[in-house]
UniProtKB/Swiss-Prot annotation:
The lineage of its organism: Bacteria, Bacillati, Actinomycetota, Actinomycetes, Kitasatosporales. It comes from Streptomyces netropsis. This is Protease inhibitor SIL-V1/SIL-V4. The record marks 70-71 as: Reactive bond. Belongs to the protease inhibitor I16 (SSI) family. GO terms for cellular component: extracellular region.
Length: 110
């Protein structure tokens, strides 16, 4: 192939960290050579990742104008695989589902 591979497994779960969270949902996302996988919006997710050059830290936001309760029910999102030929291992914790739904972007909407 002329393209470096971009294939990921993405998860969303409840817990303090990926190591102790129960995975609630998981999808596959392949962006090269074309958007595919079990992700429900593969093309939009790939476009969002390309816009930040695969930098998940730039993709995921924690700032929002949305008002969320202060409940602590942590949500953990992960990305494992390869982006543009480089190994990816990313994990981010949100304090609760409200904050997660606001900050995770299209990539983690599944």
């Amino acid at each position: 192939s002329l393209f470096a591979p971009s294939a990921l497994v993405l998860t969303v779960g409840e817990g303090e960290s990926a190591a102790d969270s129960g995975v609630q949902r998981a999808v596959t996302l392949t962006c090269t050579p074309k958007a595919s996988g079990t992700h429900p919006a593969a093309r939009a997710a790939c476009d969002q990742l390309r816009a930040v050059d695969g930098d998940f830290k730039a993709l995921v936001t924690t700032k929002s104008d949305r008002v969320c309760t202060k409940e602590y029910r942590p949500i953990v999102i992960t990305a494992e695989g390869v982006w543009d030929g480089h190994r990816v291992s990313y994990e981010h914790k949100f304090a609760n589902p409200c904050m997660a739904s606001d900050g995770k972007g299209v990539v983690f909407e599944f």
